[in-house]
Amino acid sequence: MITLLTKPTVFLITGLSGAGKTLLLQSLEDEGYYTVDNIPPHLIESFLNILCTSNVKKLAIVSDIRWKDPQKLIELFKNVESLAKCTMEIHKVFLKADKSELINRYKKTRRTHPLGLSLENAIDEEIKVMSEIESSCDIVIDTSSTEPTEFKKRFFQMIKEDMKKLKLNFISFGFKNGIPPISDYVFDVRYLPNPFYFPEMYELTGLDMKVMEFLEKFKETHETVDKIANLAKFIQDKYSESGRIEAYFCIGCTGGQHRSVYIAQKVYEILKKEGREVSIDHRDIER
């Protein structure tokens, strides 16, 4: 069985106060990321290494000038890739905005700048301190005059090259064990001929050659694979434009051992061969 999302993905976010870090964190939380705001730079190494042994595989954290230790922050962003004890995908994000825009935002919210100086002096000082960190980030976004919905769309457009397209996770399952709660799309393939009723295939699975050869004798098997694969590609392309990160295609038969395993595996292989971002999990194959 292959585990989904085995490679942790981390967004390490910083930038100017008032530039939209909280909004970005909320957007990533909506996409299933575990989020932490205002974390001290010296604790980030511990957070990263928790991912190596926990079920949390998607993390977004904000660390910025609020801890008033810019040198620690600079060192963190320059060396963060070397801190993790396991392989993970780390995206360093820097958000900024024009000084006039930041002043307007602070006036609207009536909040105090974390540096505690007069507003203009605080912004000038922060821009000066954070400039070195900006140069070490792989994603830099200027949020000046940007509406929240536009900002989210721009962010996901900018990371598309790193994250590729929306990830499609295929799960085969047995209806007798319940539909996976995480499913976005559910396909019922119980109309296909069932190898379960043939003694020589009873204990086999949809990954075994004898079962594959049996199912491939039927026209509807090939039609099912083609239709699900084409729909999956269509949905992946459309959802990628909206900024969504992943979707779950769950394919079920009675027990989750033969037909659903075969169909899910074949669709996965087709999309994988095309270079698309996909994963496969045969949930009930060993039950």
UniProtKB/Swiss-Prot annotation:
SUPFAM superfamilies assigned to the protein according to its UniProt record, in alphabetical order: P-loop containing nucleoside triphosphate hydrolases
Sorted UniProt keywords: ATP-binding, GTP-binding, Nucleotide-binding
Chain sites annotated for binding ATP: G15, L16, S17, G18, A19, G20, K21, T22
GO molecular function: ATP binding; GTP binding
Family classification: Belongs to the RapZ-like family.
Described purpose of this protein according to its UniProt entry: Displays ATPase and GTPase activities.
UniProt cross-references to PANTHER family, sorted A to Z: RNASE ADAPTER PROTEIN RAPZ
Protein name in UniProt: Nucleotide-binding protein Pmob_0154
Taxonomic lineage of the native organism: Bacteria, Thermotogati, Thermotogota, Thermotogae, Petrotogales
